[in-house]
Amino acid sequence: MSEHYIEFRGVSKAFDEHVVLDDVSFFVNHGETVVIMGRSGVGKSVALKHIMGFLKPDSGRVIVAGEDITDWNESQLAEIRRKVTMVFQSGALFDSLTVGENIAFPLQTREGITGEQIDARVAELAEMLEVADVLDKVPSEISTGTKRAVAIARALAQDPEAILYDEPTTMVDPLMAAHTSDLILKLKETLHKTSIVVTHDTHLGKKLADRLVFLHEGKVAFFGPWLEFESSQESFLRNFRLQDELIPALDVTT
């Protein structure tokens, strides 16, 4: 079995002649958390959509769970999407369902699972993600940060091998962003799942990254350990770090 769970091999993607990904190569090992960073519009979320099979590259190969999924059809991709789940920036919750029903939704079509087992799994995840007190509420009755936690719980419902987070701390206040990052860190340390986190937040990146992919003008400008990123003197990397150093990180544990 390959050490790499996810791998990009020279992936390129353009939209209307605008190149978003340009010969991008990186890998994520089993159980590792890789953070993808870069300024807005450099293709961070586009990379995640390739892993899920929502987009296909113009060139290059995408490997997931030891399989080259580049040319797979929707039926084949359904198998990968049971192994890899994605937490969208919007949360993508069902407005008409309660929080508990949203978390349970991926399990409803699973064969061989009873209602009692579904209820137990929902309770377990609600406790883990600290949303047990809102299980009977609908999404419109909870905060954006709580919606993110519910979306993460739903993504974990089927016990996937890997989870992709798309900007998990955006559009929330700093305190909730810090709380969300602490929840993701707790999951990293307890579940040890293969993970990719897309973010522009260096505080979150430093907290979570085993290694970092930094995209610049559609290319991989840096791929390696966080400490090497922090010490790099490349001007665009240094400038990116400096912009976040102006915003103090919050520690909700103190």
Task: Give the ranges of each region predicted by the language model.
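Conserved catalytic motifs of ABC-family nucleotide-binding domains
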Residues: D159
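Catalytic Walker B motif of ABC-type/P-loop ATPase nucleotide-binding domains
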Residues: I163-D166
